[in-house]
A protein has these predicted regions:
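Short beta-strand/loop element within the Bergerat-fold HATPase_c
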Residues: 65-75
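Acidic ATP/Mg2+-coordinating residue in the GHKL
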Residues: 83
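Short, small-residue-biased leader/transition segments that mark boundaries at the very start
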Residues: 1-5
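Conserved catalytic submotifs in the C-terminal HATPase_c
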Residues: 29-39
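Short alpha-helical Gxxx[C/S/T] motif in the catalytic ATP-binding
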Residues: 117, 121
Length: 154
């Protein structure tokens, strides 16, 4: 069944507020100090689902602290989320968003999931005209980098 995508102007900080509440409830500390409040063009429900999926994924693999940041450039908003989990071996990073792919940590951890969560994230980002990639964070952990169109003023 095809989902109806309703792209609209969404303030980034308002969108992250929902995630902050969910993380607080789960006992995950979140730092959003590096988030610049710009407005993305995205489907509210789909973007919330993407962010929830990413937070869930980090929590599953041992993260208990997240930080978000953003940069607004011309017509694109780049939002990233870093966790304090174990990170991912460099050679596995390109495969993380493939359906049913499960890295070393997922294969050895009971109840770690089916390998579909990040594939859904990638598809959802593409449906909203954006993209997503993973890299290891400089201080350890995983950094997920998302790009979405910036909403035009007026």
């Amino acid at each position: 069944r095809q989902m109806c995508i309703r792209d609209r102007a969404l303030p980034l900080q308002e969108t992250l507020h929902h995630i902050l509440n969910a993380c607080d409830h789960e006992g995950i500390s979140v730092d959003c100090d590096a988030v610049i409040d710009c407005t993305v063009l995205a489907d509210r429900e789909l973007l919330q689902r993407v962010l929830n999926n990413l937070v869930d994924n980090s929590r599953k693999y041992g993260a208990n602290a997240l930080s978000f940041g953003s940069v607004c450039e011309e017509d694109t908003v780049t939002l990233w989320m870093e966790d304090n989990g174990p990170g991912v071996p460099e050679e596995q990073l390109p495969c993380l968003f493939e359906p049913f792919y499960r890295g070393d940590a997922a294969r050895t951890k009971p109840g770690a999931g089916s390998g579909l969560g990040l594939a859904v994230v990638k598809k959802s980002m593409q449906q909203m005209g954006g993209n997503v990639r993973a890299e290891n964070a400089p201080g350890g952990g995983l950094r997920i980098v998302m790009q979405l169109p910036m909403a035009k003023e007026g």
